[in-house]
Amino acid sequence: MPGSLPLNAEACWPKDVGIVALEIYFPSQYVDQAELEKYDGVDAGKYTIGLGQARMGFCTDREDINSLCLTVVQNLMERNSLSYDCIGRLEVGTETIIDKSKSVKSNLMQLFEESGNTDIEGIDTTNACYGGTAAVFNAVNWIESSSWDGRYALVVAGDIAIYATGNARPTGGVGAVALLIGPNAPLIFDRGLRGTHMQHAYDFYKPDMLSEYPIVDGKLSIQCYLSALDRCYSVYRKKIRAQWQKEGNDNDFTLNDFGFMISHSPYCKLVQKSLARMFLNDFLNDQNRDKNSIYSGLEAFGDVKLEDTYFDRDVEKAFMKASSELFNQKTKASLLVSNQNGNMYTSSVYGSLASVLAQYSPQQLAGKRIGVFSYGSGLAATLYSLKVTQDATPGSALDKVTASLCDLKSRLDSRTCVAPDVFAENMKLREDTHHLANYIPQCSIDSLFEGTWYLVRVDEKHRRTYARRPSTNDHNLGDGVGLVHSNTATEHIPSPAKKVPRLPATAAESESAVISNGEH
């Protein structure tokens, strides 16, 4: 039948396509949310309890979306002893736009110049916070297609989330995540298990090309987020049940079947509400709920309609309480980065994934299914899942990816706490200068983490030049990921279809290393 899947299609696909390595970057300073409450003159607990936020990372005028992505990509390549010639696709998901024509990806190509590798597919993808997930799906689709040449795909999700002075400002943050996608991965994408919902909505958008600030309809944004979750979860449940039925399993899928459940996190409290929302869906979908002890005390809500409950405080309170243990077991750990650094837009949900991988051992993760809900305003949303490999032995791919993130909490704790008035001054400086030509950033580079790329200048033609703060640490982790390429740091296997120049493992750049996105 035209358009149908061949019966032997899976035999043609690479095995266990998924996330091989993951790197996260956030700036070296933050503002304390409790102190920000005092500075803003709001009730104590409005940000820390009401939103669930403890700290909010931010960047000075020395960092922009290009520098964030340069930093996270080079850190990933160095930490995993990867050669730049082993990347065949590079795609960036971001909504932080500093050029309406030139992509962030094209700026990242400067890192590949010395290798001579220019045969790299992919470009930027944009739809609010969903662009990173769209880029991930494109990478997976490339590897599972006739276009794949045997090399890795690299996905970068990054953003600077800032808001005008007011109620939305404490929901900001900044960061970037790089994901290495390939076969034989420790975190495997479940094939055929994506529940997607797309819809037209003006819940959050950025129509002013001269401003970094969005226009936000807060109430509509929450409704869109939760309604998209309802629909995505419904589609996902139907698809996995169909798979199970083919295997002889006639059970309904519920939250209990996820080992972990992570979600896009504008702020932590909304993620807790989203898990309660999924629990409500399970409750309404269970034909035998009156006999299921997990739903004890919820009988009065058996006839509610999902579309009537988005702002029903009684429903919200009851199901948050009833799902609290599930939240603690499956979701709470994923909020480490969100709680400590804030919203990272496209990279938010992947920061949540990093948080889980950083806090559990390979043995605790092995064999688990991780649910992932990605949401971008406007709107685009998908709920999909990752299956963790069973191999948790020392030196395994899973062991390597968790080891690479074991310092996540210490990195968060190593940042500098900045007073709210200094934070406000930095926000005003960005507001006044982010769009300027012929501009030299005013802030010092001394406070940046080692190995951080930063903005040196913007010339009179808006061309941006960057440099990297020297790093004294050796980022390499011995053999690296060691899957598609050789385990030897000085030998790398490029695409089997194309011979490109070989490059030894990248060393930290010298202090004088400068790159530019201009054609000069």
Swiss-Prot record:
BP GO annotations: acetyl-CoA metabolic process; cholesterol biosynthetic process; farnesyl diphosphate biosynthetic process, mevalonate pathway
Functional pathway: Metabolic intermediate biosynthesis; (R)-mevalonate biosynthesis; (R)-mevalonate from acetyl-CoA: step 2/3
Enzyme class label: transferase
Binding site for (3S)-3-hydroxy-3-methylglutaryl-CoA: 43-44, 129, 167, 171, 221, 264, 273, 343, 377
Phosphoserine PTM sites in chain numbering: 4, 495, 516
Functional description taken from the UniProt entry: This enzyme condenses acetyl-CoA with acetoacetyl-CoA to form HMG-CoA, which is converted by HMG-CoA reductase (HMGCR) into mevalonate, a precursor for cholesterol synthesis.
Family: Belongs to the thiolase-like superfamily. HMG-CoA synthase family.
The protein's name: Hydroxymethylglutaryl-CoA synthase, cytoplasmic
Naturally occurring in which organism (per UniProt): Cricetulus griseus
